[in-house]
Amino acid sequence: MEVFEEVRDVVVEQLSVAPDAVKIDSKIIEDLGADSLDVVELVMALEEKFGIEIPDSEAEKLISIKDVVTYIENLNKNK
């Protein structure tokens, strides 16, 4: 499964949005309707799913789904 698909599954579960609503260029807050608490919970769910740690300073930069996918792919490359 691609990283995007795994991220999409987590986003769908955490934000209760339809899978079709989650596109690579979707903005987490603007397009998917997340609030700040949703974002914190989403980051925690992503950390658990991928076995990673996302520092707050990095989490603030994750605006779109593409940002999340790129961040996770880069972490996986550096393992």
Curated annotation (Swiss-Prot):
The modification O-(pantetheine 4'-phosphoryl)serine is found at residue 36. Pfam families: PP-binding. Residues 1-76 form the Carrier domain. SUPFAM superfamilies: ACP-like (SSF47336). It is found in: Cytoplasm. PANTHER family: ACYL CARRIER PROTEIN, CARRIER DOMAIN-CONTAINING PROTEIN. This is Acyl carrier protein. It comes from Campylobacter hominis (strain ATCC BAA-381 / DSM 21671 / CCUG 45161 / LMG 19568 / NCTC 13146 / CH001A). The lineage of its organism: Bacteria, Pseudomonadati, Campylobacterota, Epsilonproteobacteria, Campylobacterales. The gene is acpP.
